[in-house]
């Protein structure tokens, strides 16, 4: 009996774009739930508003381009971008900020370059940087975590502040800790205190800190880490970029901490503060804007981790993942060019 051998590949993975996006969104949910638990319903409101704007903008652009609206919406890429923007901005930021940011991400960053698969920059991070540069006060005004807050916003409070309706609530009352002092994020607090001459140990006696990490933020990062590990298990992402991000940040922060423990945050503090785990597993791993080869992905991720540490400690913004990711996006083509495997019979590069 003669057997016919089919052409390669002989093993395939039936993972469509929509399936991958669905898995990423589902793995984001633990982090979203924990974030809402510590920072109130505002985060969920921002996410839902971002989804509405993203899907509307996606449909409008597809109609203008005379493409299939149903096919574009069903790939879930616009929804994922919306969720990432929603969890990245302060929970009680004005409604028009999330509208501007999400519309910019979908219309300009994604579709101006040709749509899904053609954008040069991560849409969510480009939107975040636009908002941070344009509205720095609103983008750096976080409320106190619920466990140390004097007052926690209810659903009604969140809606009133986000949509600026009613006059019986004020943002300032939700920034107060149990000691009556207005709170910033742990990264912001440490950076400000160090610039005022306090040591790391003195700064971390404040209520916003819980041991070596920040109140609430440790658990938020732990939840995103758990979701990220599930993503790896499901093979929705590869390990190279996430490992590179965490390794680069860990090594850079370890060197800084060893050289000056009184003026630098510990590696544990950097790994479990701000958007570290969210960015490492859900943002930096965007396959469109990252390097493509295994070695290139490791370099890409490591570059992000090192840039985050440099900007956090030397720059003007306490959390730096958006800038680090966009800078690495710029470097991705060069990384691919110099580390791509040599084709047989041709020189490398």
Curated annotation (Swiss-Prot):
The modification FMN phosphoryl threonine is found at residue 185. Its main location: membrane. Its cofactor is FMN. Keywords: Cell inner membrane, Cell membrane, Electron transport, Flavoprotein, FMN, Membrane, Phosphoprotein, Translocase, Transmembrane, Transmembrane helix, Transport. GO terms for cellular component: plasma membrane. It is found in: Cell inner membrane. It is a multi-pass membrane protein. It holds the Pfam family NQR2_RnfD_RnfE. The chain crosses the membrane at residues 20-42, 77-99, 124-144, 212-232, 239-259, 265-285, 291-311, 315-335. The keyword Cytoplasm does not apply. It comes from the Bacteria. The keyword Ligase does not apply. PANTHER family: ELECTRON TRANSPORT COMPLEX PROTEIN RNFD (PTHR30578), ION-TRANSLOCATING OXIDOREDUCTASE COMPLEX SUBUNIT D (PTHR30578:SF0). HAMAP family: RsxD_RnfD (MF_00462). Part of a membrane-bound complex that couples electron transfer with translocation of ions across the membrane. Belongs to the NqrB/RnfD family. This is Ion-translocating oxidoreductase complex subunit D.
């Amino acid at each position: 009996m003669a057997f016919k051998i089919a052409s390669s590949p002989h093993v395939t993975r039936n993972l469509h774009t929509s399936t991958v996006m669905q898995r990423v969104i589902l793995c984001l949910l633990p982090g979203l739930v924990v974030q809402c638990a510590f920072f109130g319903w505002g985060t969920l409101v921002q996410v839902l508003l971002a989804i509405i704007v993203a899907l509307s903008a996606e449909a409008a652009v597809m109609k203008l381009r005379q493409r299939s609206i149903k096919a574009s919406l069903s790939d879930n890429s616009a929804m994922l971008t919306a969720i990432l923007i929603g969890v990245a901005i302060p929970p009680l930021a004005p409604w028009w900020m999330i509208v501007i940011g999400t519309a910019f991400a979908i219309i300009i960053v994604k579709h101006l370059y040709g749509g899904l698969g053609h954008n040069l920059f991560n849409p969510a991070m480009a939107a975040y940087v636009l908002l941070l540069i344009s509205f720095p006060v609103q983008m750096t005004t976080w409320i106190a975590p619920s466990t140390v807050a004097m007052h926690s916003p209810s659903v009604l409070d969140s809606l009133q502040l986000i949509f600026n309706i009613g006059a019986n609530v004020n943002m300032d009352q939700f920034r107060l800790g149990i000691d009556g002092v207005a709170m910033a994020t742990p990264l912001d607090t440490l950076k400000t205190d160090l610039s005022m001459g306090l040591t790391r140990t003195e700064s971390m006696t404040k209520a916003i800190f819980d041991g070596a990490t920040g109140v609430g933020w440790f658990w938020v990062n732990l939840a995103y880490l758990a979701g990220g590990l599930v993503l790896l298990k499901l093979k929705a992402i590869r390990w190279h970029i996430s490992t590179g991000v965490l390794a680069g940040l860990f090594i850079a922060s370890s060197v800084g901490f060893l050289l000056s423990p009184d003026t630098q945050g510990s590696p544990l503090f950097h790994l479990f503060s701000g958007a570290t785990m969210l960015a490492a597993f859900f943002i930096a791993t965007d396959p469109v804007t990252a390097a493509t080869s295994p070695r290139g992905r490791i370099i890409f991720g490591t570059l992000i981790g090192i840039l985050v540490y440099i900007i956090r400690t030397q720059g003007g913004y306490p959390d730096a993942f958006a800038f680090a990711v966009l800078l690495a996006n710029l470097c991705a083509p060069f990384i691919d060019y110099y580390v791509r495997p040599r084709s047989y019979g041709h020189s490398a590069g």
